[in-house]
């Protein structure tokens, strides 16, 4: 897979994984689904669902460290800044040979790494972010996509990024 292929697939994900409506209950359901998937697989991840800059769901599973908490914050900041997945932002920066600092951002506050995904509502746009941290960045991204696909009854096989 090339960066261009991944960026194209992520754009498809961001379009397909949009909600008709999204509220506090939906946010909780999404967070709980991620927690269940991670627990079943023995994954030590931090999970955050933020809606309108308000934390709605947070869980830290066994194995999470304070570093993961900071990664969640920094990845979420990328989504809330650019309204696209943190992984797509990182891939685009890599493709262009740039850093977040080149865009006037502080790397201590913005992490262009996989694991945060915009919560998009059709006709409205980005209203928040769902973020995980604890796995390699591509796996973090794919886990979030899997949970969104399950919630929205979308075919994961057509959306998931292929393994490297």
From Swiss-Prot:
Q: According to its UniProt record, which protein family does this protein belong to? A: Belongs to the UPF0303 family.
Which organism is this protein's natural source? Rhizobium etli (strain ATCC 51251 / DSM 11541 / JCM 21823 / NBRC 15573 / CFN 42)
Q: Which InterPro entries match?
A: PduO/GlcC-like, PduO/GlcC-like_sf, YBR137W-like
What domain of life does the native source organism fall in? Bacteria
Q: What broad taxonomic lineage does this protein's source fall under?
A: Bacteria, Pseudomonadati, Pseudomonadota, Alphaproteobacteria, Hyphomicrobiales
Q: What is this protein called?
A: UPF0303 protein RHE_CH02903
Q: Which residues cross the membrane?
A: none
Signal peptide feature range: none
